[in-house]
Amino acid sequence: MLFLLSPAKKLDYDTPVHVEHHTQPLFVEQSAALIKVLKTLSADDVAALMSLSPALAELNVARYAAWSRKFTQHNARQAVLAFNGDVYEGLQAGSLSPARLDWAQEHVAILSGLYGVLRPLDLMQPYRLEMGTRLATPKGKNLYEFWGSTIADYLNERLAGQKTPIVVNLASEEYFKSVDLKVLKARVVQCVFQDWKNGAWKVISFHAKRARGLMARYAIEHKVAKPEGLQKFDSEGYAFDASASSADKLVFRRKA
């Protein structure tokens, strides 16, 4: 069973990392091809394409210029420790033991606009390139066309040999769209997190993102091997709601 996560825009390359173990990213050739295109853009182009402030656009132009095919602990860090948005505040990878991070390495995959798929301990150089960005490349008009079936093919490889291949989707719609479902040979289980607001159950983006990270941590800590094992998830007040769920859609709810 593989758990899919979105990346984060917020990055942390300052906090000291607590593990030495790292691996090399898998799709460096594809990343290099994207960087080549990104290097042709001015800061104004980047600001317009990605709706960034001038300062953030300049920062990312500098990142693209500095990007190297060679990943070391000097220019990169493990992806799961570099990402720092809502999902990763829920996951809190910095407090996972090396043994638990090793389990995550085998069971978690992080989708990425620039890197395609990252394993948690893959080294990652800093970047900004969301999957929904309309970046034209020789392969098409956006990143979905650039990645094509690559991500689904990779997930199939990872799941090959498993009796019942299952992908647990903890990624956002923007990122999960990069997985070609016509190519993917696995059952997909969705996790939905809802909060009670104004008299109704609603998916509230900030809370749902954090909850996806909390669920990933729960799976890592409990070495969850079957979707049913996720039903006991109860972090930060969430509880499984069987009546709102189906076999492939697990709904977790909480009242404030």
UniProtKB/Swiss-Prot annotation:
InterPro entries: YaaA
One GO term of the biological process aspect: response to hydroperoxide
Superkingdom to which the source organism belongs: Bacteria
GO CC term, one of those recorded: cytosol
Annotated family: Belongs to the UPF0246 family.
Protein's recorded name: UPF0246 protein Bpet1601
Species assigned in the record: Bordetella petrii (strain ATCC BAA-461 / DSM 12804 / CCUG 43448)
